[in-house]
C-alpha cells in the first residue's frame, strides 16, 4: 500500500496516521 497521511497540524498525529497506514488497519 501506499502510505497516505494528511498533515493535521501536529507531528504526533501525523506519525500516528502514518503508523496506522503502515499497519494496514
From Swiss-Prot:
Protein name, UniProt field: Inorganic pyrophosphatase
Enzyme class, UniProt record, top EC level: hydrolase
EC number: 3.6.1.1
Subunit structure: Monomer.
Catalytic activity: diphosphate + H2O = 2 phosphate + H(+)
Cofactor list: Mg(2+)
Keyword terms: Hydrolase, Magnesium, Metal-binding
Claim: Metal-binding is one of the keywords in the record: yes
Presence of the UniProt keyword Transcription regulation in the record: no
Family: Belongs to the PPase family.
Molecular functions per Gene Ontology: inorganic diphosphate phosphatase activity; metal ion binding
The species this protein was found in: Cyanophora paradoxa
